[in-house]
Regions:
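Generic structural signal for hydrophobic core residues of well-folded globular domains
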Residues: 1-6, 24, 102-105, 230, ...
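Short, hydrophobic/amphipathic alpha-helical patches that form generic packing surfaces
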Residues: 1-3, 18-22, 54-58, 154-160, ...
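Basic, alpha-helical nucleic-acid-binding regions used in initiation and control of genome expression
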Residues: 2-42
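Short, conserved secondary-structure transition motifs
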Residues: 6-7, 161, 296
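Intrinsically disordered or highly flexible coil/loop and linker segments, enriched in small
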Residues: 11, 29-33, 65, 108-115, ...
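Intein modules and their embedded homing endonuclease domains
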Residues: 41-208, 212-214
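P-loop NTPase catalytic core of nucleic-acid-dependent motor ATPases
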Residues: 67-90, 137, 171-173, 178, ...
Length: 296
């Protein structure tokens, strides 16, 4: 896979190696898990001595496409959750894998060691038995350490170096034509809805699922009726719907600011609330001083 990737010619696709890993995990989860396990197993022998760096390399080999350290000083971590990259406190989810996932891997290794010890004992091979006995004690010590807070702290410090991407935060949310829903990503340039990809570099998503609607669906008719009550003038109603559609494109390419004016009870607050519920974190309320105050 790595060799083929290296000799491939560049086309219009912007897929990264991380995305190919993600595609593989979606296409065949069990085979992908087996592949990643074999990748990380390369570092298991070195890790038996208890090196924090070797443990970190095991985690990198198995989870390098899912976690990023964006700042070593501030310990800022992100995890790809299927649609977006979500920030997590101190890399806590990766840290949990040390006590759970890696501990289980070394438990399985110790079971194999016990089998080899038994075989060498039955064969009355003292040299082999001593070798496996030493190995067993090393793994037993490591298993205890994997559940120790000070040991995990040191491993996470090494993970910061292994998973570090100094430009990661600069890449986030830079494509104005991608918008994340709860169940996928809509590409406004290609006019397609698809699964999220790591190289989308999205960190925010709307509060709603994407679904296809027909004009005669009950929900569509209800929204149209609501808008027609607020905007009886059909041309004004169409103008607002076109305007509202622009909110899905990042930035302000028209360089316009809109003010909703009018007396009370004319639907402004309800309309605003609907937009906020739909957009989630993408809807921001800022202080009026941003407009009325002096330039910074």
């Amino acid at each position: 896979c790595i060799y083929e990737w290296g000799i491939m010619k560049k086309h219009v696709y912007t897929y990264t190696l991380g995305t190919l890993y993600y595609f593989a995990s979606q296409d065949s989860p069990e085979l992908y898990k087996e592949y990643k396990s074999k990748q990380s197993s390369k570092f298991m022998e070195e890790a038996i001595d208890g090196s924090h760096n070797d443990i970190a390399k095991m985690l990198k080999a198995e989870h390098g496409c899912d976690f990023i350290c964006a700042s070593i000083e501030s310990k800022i971590w992100f995890q790809f959750t299927g649609q977006t990259w979500e920030q997590m406190e101190g890399g806590v989810i990766l840290r949990q894998k040390i006590s759970n996932e890696l501990s289980q891997r070394f438990t399985e290794m110790q079971c194999n060691i016990f089998k080899n010890m038994l075989d060498s004992e039955n064969a009355q091979n003292e040299g082999e038995k001593a070798k496996w006995d030493k190995r067993s004690k090393q793994v037993q010590t490591l298993r205890r350490n994997l559940k120790s807070a000070p040991f995990k702290n040191n491993v996470m410090r090494e993970c910061q170096d292994e998973f570090f991407d100094p430009r990661f935060k600069e890449k986030l949310d830079t494509n104005p034509y991608l918008i994340a829903f709860q169940n996928g990503v809509y590409d406004l340039e290609k006019n397609v809805f698809r699964k999220g990809r790591p190289e989308d570099f999205l960190s925010k998503k709307m509060n709603v699922n994407y679904r296809e609607y027909d004009d005669d669906d009950e929900e569509v008719i209800e929204v149209h009726n609501f808008l027609e009550k607020i905007f009886p003038d059909k041309s004004l109603c169409k103008y607002f719907m076109d305007l509202a559609s622009d909110v899905f494109v990042g930035g302000n390419y028209q360089k316009k600011v809109y003010f909703w004016l009018g007396s009370g009870d004319n639907g402004k607050s309800i309309l605003q609330k609907l937009m906020e519920l739909m957009l989630g974190k993408l809807a921001i309320k800022f202080d009026t001083s941003l407009i009325t105050g002096k330039k910074p």
